Structure formats: structure tokens, C-alpha cells
A protein has these predicted regions:
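Glycosyltransferases and closely related glycan-assembly transferases
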Residues: 16-24
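Charged helix-capping and loop-helix junction motifs
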Residues: 9-16
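Oxidoreductase cofactor-interface core, primarily capturing Rossmann-like NAD(P)-dependent enzymes
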Residues: 2-7, 24-28, 34-146
Length: 146
């Protein structure tokens, strides 16, 4: 659950994986949440989430996934890549995706959505033809007319 008192285990696992993979050729692929993405005003999505009422009941995972990204940015001896989904992530069609870097992406209708099928497609594309080394990228659903 998002408010889990053991949300810190996300970061614990990542630090162990980084330790084990230091100075190896094995690529570390990390799926982190959208909370560390930036909004148009320059704030992180996390800042907006922290301002919501009763956030303490569910903020543990988004907060710790932001810590994961901050930690990864300090790592220069592991071949890592991280991916953040759009704000709304869940079931849906696999019809293509649009890739970005550190900003919350929205379509022409202002929606920030990503289906699990399009997330899988983006991950497989990155594994088969790497474009990001020690970087994070984000993806959103491609609109039908894009």
C-alpha cells in the first residue's frame, strides 16, 4: 500500500542492487514513480502531492521513489536507467508512446496518462536499443492523431 510503513524498502533494495552491480557491465533498470517529475512551474510533482490533505496516509511510496531517483543521480559506476510513468498509470491499450525526460508530459487534451502496455513497450524498446545511460526518462500514451 502507498502509505505502507515499510515504503523505505524501495530505497533499501536499490542501494543493495547498486552495491552489487558497481563496476560491472550489468545494466540496472529501475521503475520509479512520477513524483520526481517536474511540473511546468518547476516544482516537482512530489511538492504538489505533499500539499494534499491526508497525504501522510499514502505518500510513503512516492516519497521513497523520489529518494531513489536522487540517489541514482549520484551513481557514476553503475550502468543504470530509470523510467517514470505519467501521472495516471494503469491498464489500457498498447498503441504507442511519447518519450520525455524530466517533465510531467500531457497530451493535447491536458491528460498525463500511460497504459501498462505502453510502459512495457517503452521499457522493451530501451532494453533492445538503449538511448539512456545514467538517466531517467518518462513516457505517456501517444494520441491517435500523433
Amino acid at each position: 500500500p502507498m502509505g505502507s510503513p515499510v515504503a523505505y524498502l524501495h530505497l533499501d533494495l536499490l542501494t543493495k542492487l547498486v552495491h552489487d552491480l558497481r563496476d560491472t557491465k550489468t545494466r540496472l533498470f529501475v521503475i520509479i514513480g512520477a513524483a520526481s517529475l517536474k511540473l511546468p512551474d518547476g516544482q516537482r510533482l512530489l511538492d504538489q502531492l505533499l500539499a494534499m490533505p491526508d497525504h501522510d496516509q499514502w505518500i510513503g511510496v512516492p516519497l521513497n521513489q523520489t529518494y531513489e531517483y536522487e540517489f541514482l543521480q549520484m551513481i557514476d559506476n553503475v550502468d543504470w536507467v530509470a523510467v517514470s510513468p505519467s501521472r495516471n498509470f494503469g491498464p489500457g491499450p498498447t498503441n504507442g508512446y511519447v518519450m520525455g525526460t524530466d517533465q510531467v508530459m500531457v497530451d493535447a487534451k491536458g491528460k498525463s496518462e500511460l497504459s501498462n502496455g505502453n510502459m512495457a513497450l517503452a521499457i522493451l524498446d530501451e532494453i533492445e536499443a538503449p538511448k539512456h545511460r545514467r538517466q531517467r526518462f518518462t513516457v505517456r500514451n501517444q494520441e491517435v492523431d500523433e
